[in-house]
Design a protein with these regions (language model features):
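Small-residue-biased structural context
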Residues: 1-163
Length: 163
């Protein structure tokens, strides 16, 4: 039987992988093959994680009135993260502008996952029962696999993104 710590530990495992990819990307330079490959891996990982997290965790938390505001906040940040990834993908990796944007993205994304882990997950756990946990664990793993198979890098400048 799944427990609160299991689903949240699983999400934190993904976050740790994301932190490692961010660190590796910060160590790359210019329009290198390493930067391109790591950015593609990060993009697919983040997009699939966000979609699975929304379908497993956040859809459950939206049904719990005390956590609705926190949940909406996180989902809105997921949208901002995807826009930033698309903007980075549309920016020349060899330009100084790319690294500047990436450093801002790195800071914002780390803030997002720290907030989830330190504030939201402990709060959410108070409102979840074993049935919720089992459902979320099952949905997350299935959706993560499916979403990762479909995820792609989609270049789109922020100023061109539809609101």
């Amino acid at each position: 039987m799944a427990t609160a710590t299991e689903i949240f530990e699983r999400l934190k495992q993904d976050h740790d992988k994301h932190r490692a990819l961010l660190d590796k990307l910060l160590d790359t330079s210019g329009d290198s093959n390493d930067r391109e490959a790591l950015f593609e891996e990060l993009t697919k990982e983040l997009k699939s994680h966000a979609a699975a997290e929304e379908q497993a965790l956040y859809s459950t938390m939206l049904r719990k009135p005390p956590t609705t505001d926190e949940t909406r906040h996180s989902v809105a940040e997921h949208h901002e993260i995807e826009e930033a990834l698309n903007d980075l993908a549309a920016t020349d990796m060899s330009s100084g502008g790319w690294l500047t944007k990436f450093k801002t993205f790195d800071h914002d994304y780390r803030h997002h996952i720290d907030e989830e882990e330190e504030d939201h997950f402990p709060d959410f756990a108070k409102y979840l029962d074993d049935k919720d946990m089992e459902h979320m664990e099952r949905v997350f793993e299935r959706r993560k696999r499916e979403e990762k198979a479909e995820a792609e890098v989609t270049p789109e400048k922020k100023e061109d993104a539809k609101e």
